[in-house]
Amino acid sequence: MAQSVPPGDIHTQPGSKIVFNAPYDDKHTYHIKITNAGGRRIGWAIKTTNMKRLGVDPPCGVLDPKENVLMAVSCDTFDATREDINNDRITIEWTNTPDGAAKQFRREWFQGDGMVRRKNLPIEYNL
């Protein structure tokens, strides 16, 4: 029954983008707080547009209502003068968990006919 109700909102801190500052010859890590602002348990997963440069830990999880998680987004070393840095972003996807499901993330929650919501956080690189 959980799949017939759209997933509630999430809040992220920061709310609209992630900024990494030069120099890029050392690994940078930025923390994002994700809060389940809805009234149902959700499963969430992170996707990135640049798997080679951007890492996410943890990459997925489960949040009860009003619960939050601190997630690390890391940017590996790269040459900003020779690589395209214009379209990087991370996308947070979330969906309601099935009623009675254990609090353990399952990829198949995102593959059924239930509604999946998305929030994009663009990555900005200051040179």
UniProtKB/Swiss-Prot annotation:
PANTHER family, sorted = MAJOR SPERM PROTEIN, MSP DOMAIN-CONTAINING PROTEIN-RELATED
Q: Which tissues does the record link to its expression?
A: Sperm.
Q: Which residues carry this modification: N-acetylalanine?
A: A2
Cellular-component GO terms for this entry: cytoplasm; cytoskeleton; pseudopodium
Q: Which UniProt keywords apply?
A: Acetylation, Cell projection, Cytoplasm, Cytoskeleton
Q: Where found? A: Cell projection, Pseudopodium; Cytoplasm, Cytoskeleton
Please identify the protein, giving its name as recorded: Major sperm protein 2
Q: Which SUPFAM superfamilies match?
A: PapD-like
Q: Which residues form the MSP domain?
A: 9-126
Q: Which Gene3D superfamilies match?
A: Immunoglobulins
Provide an example Pfam family for this protein.
Motile_Sperm
Q: What function does the entry list?
A: Central component in molecular interactions underlying sperm crawling. Forms an extensive filament system that extends from sperm villipoda, along the leading edge of the pseudopod.
